[in-house]
């Protein structure tokens, strides 16, 4: 350490302008008086003086009182308490002349080392700790997710199923309105039949009146259908009237049967229950027959018109051919393949062989010749 300090002093030299970097070593074994009296030293130093640009040492509280071992009056605590502060400089502890040589050597070596380090003027900068922005202050909070959910929580599937049900014909209001009304009318007809069965014991006349109302309604339907047929000039009014008369006769026969049954019930009081039940069944059968006749009246009238026209009027073949019949049109369309294009199935393929137009024209020309 001493060799390094001497080499440093030789390189820098005492005549350098930067005097703070120059350290003059005191002679070994010399005391403070010799240092002050040495005229060879360019810088007069006093032991314990604070060097410029250095920090002050922290002096513990024990060293500031009479327990300081470096104090000159360490053994005389009672007499020299006031002089204890004079031995302690600002921040440093100065050994006194009463110290032994070993303590002086240790103090001189430590002071030389510290002076050398201070002479280097090394600035130590302590940067403020920077917070790492990449590291989060707290751990992420886990969010529990249910692995299994109830059937009611799956809104998407329930919506899809409802939409699929809505697209079906059974739930479509536009397409199934007529079928819904039809089911209601059938249910009402069954209810009316059950009411007839249950109430014929005391209200047999009501069943007959309801039958008459149904027959009148049936006659009104016949009149409306006949009016529609009269709009067609090719229909035969006489045949329509005959059909109406026949239907009315059937209704009258039904009414007569009901009246006969009622008379029999009056004559035989013991068989009232059975006859009333028979009347109810007859009324239900009549209502079903009326509904069947009502459903097929248009077809029967049209077929009767055609048959009567063929039998009675042999000269009206042209008029009969003008009567529109859907089934006849479809048959003619299928058979007449020479003038109509072939029908196509669901895949777009023709069922019949395609005939080019020039062949059709040639065939037609050959027929004319």
Curated annotation (Swiss-Prot):
Lineage: superkingdom: Eukaryota
Annotated region (Disordered), positions in chain: 1-42, 60-107, 146-177, 214-369
Biased composition regions of type Acidic residues, renumbered to the chain: 155-169
Bias (Polar residues): 12-24, 87-101
Low complexity: compositionally biased ranges: 30-42, 70-86, 219-324
Name of the protein this chain belongs to: Putative uncharacterized protein DDB_G0275317
Organism expressing this protein natively: Dictyostelium discoideum (Social amoeba)
